[in-house]
Amino acid sequence: MPQVSYVNGGGFVNRREFIISAAAVTAVPELSGCRTPATAGGRILFGACRGPDDVKLMSSVGYDFWEWNVGAAFDPDKDDEWWKAQRDRIAALPLPLRSCNGFIPGKFRLTGPKADHGPALDYAERALRRAEEAGVKTVVFGSGGARNVPGDYTIAGVPGPDVEKGVRQYADFCRELCRRVADLRTVQVVIEPLRPNESNIINYVWQAEQICADVASPRLGVLADIFHMMMGRESAASIVAAGKWLKHCHIASFATRNFPGAEPETVSRFKPYFDALKAIGYTGGVSCECGWGKGEDYEKNLETALKCLRRL
């Protein structure tokens, strides 16, 4: 059965058809040029997924921003008094909190027969409003535990995950969330494709792009996780095809999922993806979402990763 993707109008396109269209966009300068992100000029920004205790060190090494967890940063279950103090703590740090991940906790069900979008929408809306107040640009929507389609559907009498219906439920959630936060101006939710052994829906950048195109909201974009792309053998052409939808990236080394530069022999695998980012004029963030090591090695590894990324 071909890999499928949600597309405008509720139809499906298989992976081969999408790759052909992506290759066409890449090959025609007039098309690829009109698909570049809205931001112009500048350069790619580099950050790391770490907590606030590490931000001072990251700043001294030369990183541009940091990325934290939504629950830790904004905790939508806590009151406004807590949030005001938290917002001040974030603002006092020497680097901007540009992105956050871990958007929807696994306690919420977004797909399957027991999906209940109401509580998850309330949680997500409050998180996004706090994220905008804090100056966050992108909130990463991976959340495999919440989005993975459970196996308790029945298809033609056979129990199993109804992936197509699950993707529609996920897209419906994105659509309603974007409607609720249409008044926001800067923060965007970015759909994170996860490799197949972590999620049974939205495994490729081109699939996330189809949902974005259908929802058609300025509050929704795409994330390209270069580690997941390498593991899923997804071509860098998907980055070019995503073009204007691409708002954030993650990266980790190929074999061990450690910091960039931890495996000198595999660094060359990053180059096609960075060439694609440069081809579309990408000036968003690239966060190291990876293992770092401990103790004295940690600072050295932060430096190694940043040097590696700047050379690409």
Question: For the regions a protein language model found, what residue spans apply to each?
Answer:
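Histidine-acidic metal/acid-base catalytic patches
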Residues: 6, 16-24, 28, 36-46, ...
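Active-site acidic/histidine proton-transfer and metal-coordination neighborhood
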Residues: 23, 28, 109-221, 300, ...
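N-terminal secretory signal peptides
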Residues: 1-13
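Active-site loop signature of alpha/beta-hydrolase-fold enzymes
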Residues: 105, 196, 229
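Structural motif corresponding to the early beta-alpha repeats
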Residues: 64, 68-171, 257-260, 270, ...
